[in-house]
Amino acid sequence: MNTNRRKKGRKKKDVETMTAPEPFSPAAVKQLTARVPEVQRALLDNLDAFPQYPETPLLKAGDQYEGIWLEHNQDNFFLADYAPESAWGSQDAFLRFQREDGLFPFALPLNYRKEGNFFYGYDRCFWHVQTVWPFARCAMEIARKTGRPEEDFARIYRGAAAYDSWFVHHRCEAESGLPAMYCEYDTGHDNSPRVTDGGIPHSCPGDDANNMPDLPEMPILSVDLSAALYGGRIALAELADLLGKNAEAAEWRAKAEMTRLAIRRYLYDEEDEFYYDRATTGFRKYRTEHVTRLFLNRVLTQEEFDRVYERYFCTPGREFLPPYPLPSVSIDDPSFRHGIRNSWGGNTQALTSLRALFWMGYYHRGTDREALLLRWMKAFEEHPESTFQQELDPFTGAPIGDGVNYTPTLLLFLEAAKLPQFTSGRPV
């Protein structure tokens, strides 16, 4: 289905702008491909039994994130190739623990019964939103991939519609209809100046995502939450189509179009050709990877995408194209911070790159998709000390932090290992 209003005609060819690293030597190819079984085992070792959901093991984000996170839900799309019941289990768990007002938990912690644990006493958490790839889209694609019955698509539809309603009633600003960001973790951008400057708290007041902090700039209309709202509405329209709810499908598409137009009207800076959050005082001009979430949710037309991408993602050594691409903040932005652990203030994040696999091909950047995966593979080759941490130095590819087997990083390795130069002579 055409959800991005492309004109009919000859298919646009892929455009190459992201340079792939030098070819891997035969020895490097052999060394890297030999690790595939080990990495697959590490991925499956991240499955764990959750006391609040005993039906099937669920996929943790990694050793330093012992739980399932809503912002990590796309990890389950890839997991479905290895453990389909567990991939669906996370969707079922989020639906089961959805709050009565429609809010999904941002996390289901694993060790909530353990005294001294950060999440002690919380088997589900509603402290902030932390949504990126909409639940409606992710759950629907996983349900398709794992062959779920129609009743599960109906559950997804009901749950996602209630979630949309929660946003409308608790986060969407009246004039624009766009959702506001209330706290740092709403968007998952830990330690990014974009979501901390001005005294913005980590979580919402009272540990409840309904509550807006009493700050002069609030509410702050959020680019990425607006993108997720749009993407969720397009997915809801597709679900309604599947369920034979044609009138409701049309309503969701109309709502999505209103969101798309509002994003353009309120959040786009024509001079900068960039999308910014808008506070009561005006644009908050941080050039961060939040713009890729417009790509992820296919908010932009091809022409709009090309304008942003070619200005900010196509010049080597500038903006979002350092040697290890897609840093969390443009390397030319004054707020860029280098070398800080667990920082969306500058480091190249595995989550950003994993999500890019969903949008690069759609926007005719398939060659860049391959080049991005090869850059990650080059980092694994050149830094054998890597334990599959969550982030890289954008200039050297060196792993940052001491985490082990972060799920998105494992998945990037496995996806890169499917590229032709690594699959010759072995089954995928």
Question: Locations of the language-model features?
Answer:
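Short Lys/Arg-rich cationic patches that frequently serve as NLS/NoLS or arginine-rich RNA/DNA-binding motifs
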Residues: 2-14, 180-181, 190
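Extended glycan-interaction surfaces of carbohydrate-active proteins
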Residues: 20-67, 91-125, 173-220, 261-348, ...
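Extended, well-ordered alpha-helical scaffold segments
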Residues: 27-42, 83-96, 149-168, 232, ...
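Alpha-helical support elements that line or immediately flank enzyme active sites
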Residues: 70-101, 290-302, 353-366, 370-376
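Core register positions within helices of long alpha-helical scaffolds
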Residues: 79, 138-141, 232, 239, ...
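TPR repeat positional signature
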Residues: 132, 136-139, 226, 233, ...
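Acidic/aromatic-lined carbohydrate-recognition and catalytic surfaces
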Residues: 135-162, 172-174
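Short, contiguous, pocket-lining structural segments
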Residues: 217-231, 248-251, 255, 286, ...
